[in-house]
Amino acid sequence: MNLHANTALRPVLHPSLRPLPLLLSLGLAACGSNYAVTPHITGQVIGSYYENAQVCLESSTSKLTCDSGSAAVRTAADGSYTLDGQGAVLATIGTDAIRHETMGDAGSKVTQKLLLRAPAGHSAFVSALSTELAQIMDGNGGDFAAASSKLAARLGVSEAGLASDFNKASGDELTKLKAENASVTALVASASTQAVPADALAALNGALALNNIQTIVVIYAENRGFDNLYGLFPGANGVPGVNPTSSTAYVPQKDVDGSTLPVLPPTWGGMTAAGQSTVITQAQSVNLPNKPFQIDDASSPLYLPQSVITRDLVHRFYNNQMQINGGANDKFAAYSDAGGLSMGYYDGSKMQLWDIAKQYALADNLFIGAFGGSFLTHQYLICACAPTYPNADTSVAKGSIAKIDVDAKGNFLRLTPSATAPTTVLNGAPAYANDGALTPADSSGMFYAVNTMQPAFQPSSNAPASGDSSKLYADTGKANTLPPQTQTNIGDLLSGKNIDWAWYAGAWKDTTALATASARASSFPNPPNFQFHHQPFNYFANMDPVKAPAYRAAHLRDFDSQFLSDASAGKLPPVAFYKPQGNLNQHAGYASVADGDAHIAGVIAQLKKSPQWKNMLVIVTYDENGGFYDHAAPPKGDRWGPGTRVPAILVSPYVKKGLVDHTQYDSASILRAITHRFALPVLDGLSTRDKALVANGGKPMGDFSAALALVPQE
């Protein structure tokens, strides 16, 4: 058997040795008979070597299924097979197959189904690598030479190595080929769990496409729900009653007692932030119809352009759950300290980011990982967890434990209203007995920080204690200083595999200098309006500025002096988070939509000039909705979330152009993408979330691979 020949004819005898009937047959064939020689394909199914795998010709019209005219065969102990016919090959390795690490060993049972492919004319070895080549060819018009050249270059191996039994390679090539085979086999195993071949193909395409990404950049903006900025986006699940592609009709807002509000409540204190040249007062905002309204509608008496900063809106852990109201999303106005402003949205087509979303991809089904405000959503972004505060009830923070009402099973119902809380939101904003930063103790006795607390390391809004000569720590005697955290985060996992990463923050260097100055000022400048609780890694014990200064300096970096220069030089780490400074992050209350839009669009323009751009994925999303209404019901997950829907823009040469991606995501889908791309251990919180979603009748969150193509789109 010639394992390197893709097609072979059955042996031909010398004429002098041929029997008379055969000579007569050949003579008849020469005279026009129907006699024909059947071609066949020989090869091996390898990874190790797979015995008893089913092999067939793959359908040219329905990938990952056998051609209807192809008879399937089973592989021998060495993985070898012979098929009649010609074409692409499909190997189904079921749990009845045997996996041999080396030929001749006893082997072991296969525990997870695998679907492997090989392109037509290149099926001498059917493996995860041949599958990857076949997938690339699906996207490049069937060009094997281009697919082989591209994959070999990415892996740093020879094209001959891709087409060989890599188990017999040696040295660096063996290491690289076996590593890629193992990585892709895991992706194939995951995709092969799909019941429908087309779904399995799509899942595998996305997972392999993610492997093309060498640099992931996350730009984490602030406090905008999806409907608030992208509710009018064509093809997206936008503002109900306004965007024709909205998935639902509008559900009117309810009062605190559940009755339908006749009108929206006023915007308490007026619609504009202090210091704006344009002012919309509380009195001007009364009697708005009970429905979403456009803030930047030039024909409205309440017109506010995107350059004007509106007042802030409450956005806290329990408050967000009360506004969502089990998925009805009908109590945003009732449980907002900004009343009717919570129902406002913008014409996002005026933004530069809108144009970028149209050119690349907009995800319209991403929910914040955790309910509530920026503090918790930043923590969830990096660890898929909530910060802990052990023994809070006997600590200086005991007054920060929230008071909540629960049902008979202990499930959260609402924040306990204060004695003076209005009975209708039309008479005033809601008031609570204690909407503190900490949860009551759970069944294990642990307290969790879910609303803003300060880091124990500088920069922190809490100054150093009077006896701290280093000036590098925050005063732990303050009730809102959180003890250093020790949970595993994504940085730990990346560092554990020697994969570089960094959190770049706007104004980090300057603010750190001010915070640690011997004569620290009582306030910090605005701009930049640096936000201490937007720096999640600074809360973790392994970032101690005295005990781990080198680790800290390596991973907590300054945007202004480092990010763009790193990008320009092609030196961004494989994983880079960027947090814009306060006045450029689009946060209502202290930043305008327009300023943040221009800044982030400018950063993307610079990233596209980077030498790393050709294999870069930029994810622009928002930490939370900022108290603004969104109509999409969050899927039911675990006790931390997911919360309200926010926008996400995916920018990369590998992004499917002009896509509105309806795949279900949450903020921690960023962690999933990083985890899958770099083969990291899975954070406990990711597993907990996905299991909870499935247990509640939903599906796990995606990892953005559905928006990616296997070949560059530009």
What is the meaning of each model-derived region?
Residues 206-714:
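N-terminal pro-sequences and low-complexity stem/linker regions of secreted or lumenal proteins
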Residues 27-30:
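C-terminal motif of bacterial Sec signal peptides marking the signal peptidase cleavage site
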Residues 1, 5, 108, 112, ...:
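Generic cytosolic/nucleocytoplasmic N-terminal low-complexity/intrinsically disordered segments
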